[in-house]
UniProtKB/Swiss-Prot annotation:
One term of GO molecular function: tRNA binding
Record function comment: Hydrolyzes ribosome-free peptidyl-tRNAs (with 1 or more amino acids incorporated), which drop off the ribosome during protein synthesis, or as a result of ribosome stalling. Catalyzes the release of premature peptidyl moieties from peptidyl-tRNA molecules trapped in stalled 50S ribosomal subunits, and thus maintains levels of free tRNAs and 50S ribosomes.
Protein name (Swiss-Prot/TrEMBL): Peptidyl-tRNA hydrolase
Any GO BP: protein quality control for misfolded or incompletely synthesized proteins
Species assigned in the record: Buchnera aphidicola subsp. Acyrthosiphon pisum (strain APS)
PROSITE patterns documented for this protein: PEPT_TRNA_HYDROL_2
EC class of the enzyme, as a word: hydrolase
């Protein structure tokens, strides 16, 4: 299962905080798949077959700080453990254009990840695909920064890193689980 973290509502679609959903939309498009609204999972879903692996995709359609409900509902329904889920999210510690795959426990201060960890109530490692968005100079500006659109240059760099990850099939590194 792959989850692209985001906030709902049209006003947030182009924000830095929604790059997780940017990745999933691009991934689904590369496999000619469309998302459908699944109310029972509080999100948009589709599925792919990658290297003979059937993979479910989820973009929660609820706010970032409560998206654990959506992830937990779908994971429980399909009997998927947190350790078998790849969470795709924005990362303040990486510059735009940089993305990294990580397998670890924790949320590093990311509210979406925090809610997922708290909802599953488990201290276990899980896969994260971190997409760099950069960081504002002032710590007090983090909320407004992640909820704002990237500059044109940053958006190009972010989109290139997403397309590069899809073309290089970074998922093949974790499909063994």
């Amino acid at each position: 299962m792959i989850v692209g973290l985001s906030n709902p509502k049209k006003e947030y679609h182009s924000t830095r905080h929604n790059v997780g959903s940017w990745y999933l939309y691009s991934l689904a498009e590369s496999y000619l798949r469309n998302f459908k609204n699944e109310k029972k999972f509080f999100g948009f879903t589709t599925s792919l077959n990658i290297e003979s692996n059937y993979i479910r995709l989820l973009i929660p359609n609820i706010f970032m700080n409560i998206n654990g409900q959506s992830v937990f509902k779908m994971a429980s329904f399909y009997n998927i453990n947190l350790s078998e889920i790849l969470i795709v999210h924005d990362d303040l510690e990486l510059q735009p254009g940089i993305s990294k795959l990580k397998y670890s426990y924790g949320h590093n201060g990311h509210n979406g990840l925090r809610d997922i960890v708290n909802t599953f109530n488990k201290n276990i490692n899980f896969y994260r695909f971190r997409i760099g968005i950069g960081r504002p100079i002032n710590r007090d500006q983090i909320a407004s920064f992640v909820l704002s659109n990237p500059t044109k240059k940053e958006k190009i760099l972010i989109q290139k890193s997403i397309l590069h990850a899809i073309e290089k099939n970074v998922l093949s590194n974790i499909l063994k689980f």
